[in-house]
A protein has these predicted regions:
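Conserved AMP-binding/adenylate-forming
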Residues: 36, 49-95, 214
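Conserved AMP-binding/adenylation subdomain of ANL enzymes
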Residues: 183-210, 214-281
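AMP-binding/adenylate-forming catalytic core of the ANL superfamily
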Residues: 112, 355, 360-361, 384-467, ...
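Structural core segment of the AMP-binding/adenylate-forming
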Residues: 79, 83-150, 436-451
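Gly/Ser/Thr-rich phosphate-binding loop
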Residues: 255-259, 267-329, 342, 427
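Conserved pre-ATP/AMP-binding loop-to-beta segment of ANL
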Residues: 18-21, 144-161, 167-168, 198-210
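Conserved AMP-binding A3 loop
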Residues: 35-39, 157-185
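Conserved ATP/PPi-binding loop(s) of AMP-dependent carboxylate-activating enzymes
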Residues: 336-339, 346-372, 392, 407-411
Length: 490
């Protein structure tokens, strides 16, 4: 199996699948679908690599930052930059200037490639970085150049910022070996998809699938697809704006999609209301394990869909647990170890992972690195779980979210949130410590607040004294989430 970027481009793209479609997207100006084959993609990667090598002095190890919505050039710049010897850095272009400027100062970019859209801090970007700010297709008029196999598999190649829910993001340092260790899991997932497809449609001999990429490419969950989908010569159908979800999906048939909770719920409603035709043949929603209600997942399965769930972190390059279960009770699980790294539950029940998937560390933060990776190389995920007799792991809660009371008891906010969400009037909620009390921030309609309070009163009667919710705040507006749809706790 290919185990490096150079071979992925020169062997897989240029020799194995040159004529297959690598990318599709809808051109907004015309509403038509544009395509790039793997041969065209590889030529543009060669253009980009040549441009970076010529225009970034002493390019080796220099930072190239991408600030852009999902687009074809994102993939070109990713491989072009690292093949030239630079370090590729992805960032959330929609962050407020306070956060974005902090991340940029940490990364010290030699070059910032952007899509030209003003996300609210264009003036500050231009004032701070001037000539270092260039368009995503800056290389378009450059002749394709030669490529060298020179990436050190154990050296820093890519930096991605964590989508934190409790504080500042950290810059995760990943090497080439991290990505290609994880490819073993992704290739196996692809085999599972083909097996399901051929069992459902035995007359369909087509082994080429396509993935609808709606989640942002700056996040590992989508970014990893730039590496994994070329392995089988499959296509990424890019969507850059959630508002165009149904338009783009209708124009580009897609088999698979990685989804956040809000989008999974939308797909579920379409299926349950007899509007599956809006999904244009989509049959494989893939999401982060334990983020979805099992009733929702089972409803999709009953209507012919195949659910895949993955548990991982940016710090493990997305590697971790995989769940192919399509029925209770295992559909609620995080999944099983994928078999390509080592996994264990420590004495506290925390999931720990060791192997080629584990990051190099947090950039310029050795203290935080030492807190998460122990002296024996085990990465401590911060997630608490239990294992059943079939080898499935089930989420218990986040270690850092535990509310530790003055009496010594530990309270899992996730468990209380699950119970609160059983109230029909609760749209969403976050349980956290509020002034030494267990508190709940609840989104619901103003006229429903009394009913929610009554529900909490009844719930408290069923809970031990130390678990009872004694502080409640309401919001008529949706609670804040990060870029991947996770509720913020800060």
């Amino acid at each position: 199996m290919v185990n490096n970027v150079y071979d992925l481009v020169t062997r897989t793209m240029e020799q194995e699948f040159p004529g297959r479609v690598a990318f599709r997207w809808v051109e907004d100006a015309t509403g038509t679908v544009k395509e790039k084959t793997y041969a065209e993609y590889a030529q543009d990667i060669r253009r980009a690599a040549a441009w970076f090598a010529r225009n970034i002095p002493e390019v080796e190890g220099k930072r190239v930052v991408l600030l852009s919505r999902n687009c074809y050039e994102y993939g070109v710049n990713t491989f072009g930059a690292v093949l030239a010897g630079a370090v590729l850095v992805t960032m959330n272009q929609k962050k407020a200037w306070d956060e974005l400027s902090w991340e940029l100062e940490l990364a010290e970019p030699a070059l910032i490639l952007n899509d030209g859209v003003d996300y609210g801090c264009r003036d500050q970007l231009e004032a701070a970085y001037g000539e270092r700010l260039r368009p995503m297709d800056v290389w378009k008029d450059t002749a394709p150049g030669g490529l060298e196999k020179k990436i050190d598999p154990n050296a820093l190649m890519v930096m991605l910022f964590t989508s934190g829910t409790t504080g500042r993001s950290k810059a995760v340092m990943l090497a080439e070996r991290n990505f290609f260790t994880v490819m073993q899991m992704h290739v196996a997932m692809g085999d599972h998809l083909l097996d399901f497809k051929h069992r459902q449609l035995p007359e369909d001999k087509n082994d080429v699938l396509s993935n609808f990429a709606i989640l942002p490419l700056f996040h590992l969950g989508t970014f990893i697809c730039l590496f994994s989908w070329p392995f089988k010569g499959w296509a990424l159908n890019l969507c850059s704006d959630l508002r165009n979800f149904y338009r783009d999906l209708g124009l580009m048939h897609s088999d698979s999609i990685a989804v956040a909770p809000v989008l999974m719920e939308s797909i579920y409603k379409d299926v349950k209301r007899g509007r599956a035709d809006k999904l244009n043949g989509l049959w494989n929603p893939c999401g982060s394990s334990a983020m979805f209600d099992s009733e929702l997942l089972l409803g999709l399965v009953e209507n012919g869909m195949y659910i895949t769930q993955c548990y991982g972190m940016t710090e493990t390059c997305g590697d971790g647990l995989v769940n192919y279960a399509q029925a209770e009770p295992h559909i609620r699980a995080l999944g099983k170890p994928d078999g390509h790294c080592e996994y264990k539950l420590d004495e506290t029940g925390e999931i720990c992972i060791r192997g080629g998937c584990v990051m190099l560390g947090y950039y310029k933060d050795p203290e935080a690195t030492a807190e998460i990776i122990d002296k024996d190389g085990w990465l401590h995920t911060g997630d608490l779980a239990r294992e059943d007799e079939d080898g499935y792991y089930y989420m218990v809660g986040r270690k850092k979210n535990l509310i530790i009371l003055g009496t010594g008891e530990n309270v899992s906010p996730e468990e209380l949130e699950r119970r609160l969400n059983a109230c029909p009037e609760v749209q969403e909620c976050v349980v956290k410590e509020m002034g030494k009390k267990i508190g709940a921030l609840i989104c619901c309609a103003e006229e429903k607040q009394a009913e929610v309070r009554a529900f909490i009163t009844g719930l408290n009667r069923t809970l031990p004294l130390y678990q009872r919710i004694t502080a409640v705040e309401f919001s008529a507006e949706p609670l804040p989430r990060n870029a991947m749809g996770k509720l913020l706790r800060r």
